[in-house]
Amino acid sequence: MMSKKMKVLVVDDSPVFRALLSEIINSDPQLEVIGAAEDPYQAREMIKALKPDVLTLDIEMPKMNGVQFLKNLMRLHPLPVVMISTLTQHGADATLMALELGAVDYFPKPSVANTADMLGYRSLVNEKIRMAAQAQVGANQSMSPAVASSSAVSTSQYQLIAIGASTGGTEAVKHLLSALPASMPPIVITQHISAMFSGPFASRLDASCALSVSELTQGEVALKANHAYVAPGDKHLMVFRRGGQLYAHLDDSPAVNRHKPSVDVMFGSVAESLKGKAIGVILTGMGKDGAQGMLQMKQQGAITVAQDEQSCVVYGMPRAAVECGAAMHIKPLNKLPQFLCDLLS
């Protein structure tokens, strides 16, 4: 027997894009467009009448922009939302704000570049919408951790923390980092994100954390304590040791698990270069990127921890890590900062 289709409401002011997106979504046997609204006011009435499972929402719209509408929606009628973004600096800031307000995910409007790969674009859009329909909306919001305290970090046996995340991760990473003290070993972060968004993402983290956070932009950087480094959205971040010093370098080889940057690539390099002197953390996200790399870390003697199902927006990557035996510990997001600090002291 066929299961019930997930009901999608499309909100976009362009009639051409509404038609294209509706056609893409309806091509998926699990999804069905039950309506298309041209502005937030029309969307509000349609949400009440049609009760969609998931909403796609354009960031740039007349009358009221998508972010403002999302803010009202999350307060009055929380439901899974996937933002449709432009790959611009302004689009990046607005999208990250939308994710902070509770949107599950985003995808870019098709450009000339990605129309060439319309099949790939189609499957990306539908996968994100299917995932969002099953996401736990507000999982991050309810899990704000207390600021953790730590002592004697400089003498810890653990010389590096590696964090991997995908859907829901921009907020989970922020919650985790903003609750960590300023004194920490170097932290490397691979978050699945568009290249245009990784810089603004790092800047937002930097503004909300005691640690110094930056996007890795040069080919090779010596890793420093009390600093966190974010992989750019189009290159793998790898860690290696030269002499007594740890370095991160950017790798332009093909995508792994369909992702670039890939968490598996980062974790694998950490396993090789630090053996048991690292901590691996896998947070919310769809798919299974990071599970095999985390298993390598565990086999080399590192400590590994996965975010628990209840606090994940999407329990995909952590589930894969748990199921393959890679995760030694499973913790809710709000307990992770203190757990890391306890390990370090």
Curated annotation (Swiss-Prot):
CDD domains reported in the protein's UniProt record: CheB_Rec, REC_CheB-like
Top-level taxon of origin: Bacteria
Keyword hit for Phosphoprotein: yes
Post-translational modification remark: Phosphorylated by CheA. Phosphorylation of the N-terminal regulatory domain activates the methylesterase activity.
InterPro entries: CheB-like, CheB_C, CheY-like_superfamily, Sig_transdc_resp-reg_Me-estase, Sig_transdc_resp-reg_receiver
Any one GO molecular-function label of the UniProt entry: protein-glutamine glutaminase activity
GO biological process: chemotaxis
Active-site residues annotated for this sequence: 166, 192, 289
Pfam families according to UniProt: CheB_methylest, Response_reg
Keyword Phosphoprotein (UniProt): yes
Residues in Response regulatory domain copies: 7-124
GO cellular component: cytoplasm
EC number: 3.1.1.61, 3.5.1.44
Reactions that this protein is recorded to catalyse: [protein]-L-glutamate 5-O-methyl ester + H2O = L-glutamyl-[protein] + methanol + H(+); L-glutaminyl-[protein] + H2O = L-glutamyl-[protein] + NH4(+)
Locations listed in the record: Cytoplasm
Chain positions found as 4-aspartylphosphate: 58
Keywords recorded for this protein, A-Z: Chemotaxis, Cytoplasm, Hydrolase, Phosphoprotein
Function: Involved in chemotaxis. Part of a chemotaxis signal transduction system that modulates chemotaxis in response to various stimuli. Catalyzes the demethylation of specific methylglutamate residues introduced into the chemoreceptors (methyl-accepting chemotaxis proteins or MCP) by CheR. Also mediates the irreversible deamidation of specific glutamine residues to glutamic acid.
HAMAP family hit by this protein: CheB_chemtxs (MF_00099)
Classification via PANTHER family: PROTEIN-GLUTAMATE METHYLESTERASE/PROTEIN-GLUTAMINE GLUTAMINASE, PROTEIN-GLUTAMATE METHYLESTERASE_PROTEIN-GLUTAMINE GLUTAMINASE
Entry remark concerning the domains of this protein: Contains a C-terminal catalytic domain, and an N-terminal region which modulates catalytic activity.
UniProt family annotation: Belongs to the CheB family.
Identification of the protein by name: Protein-glutamate methylesterase/protein-glutamine glutaminase 2
Gene: cheB2
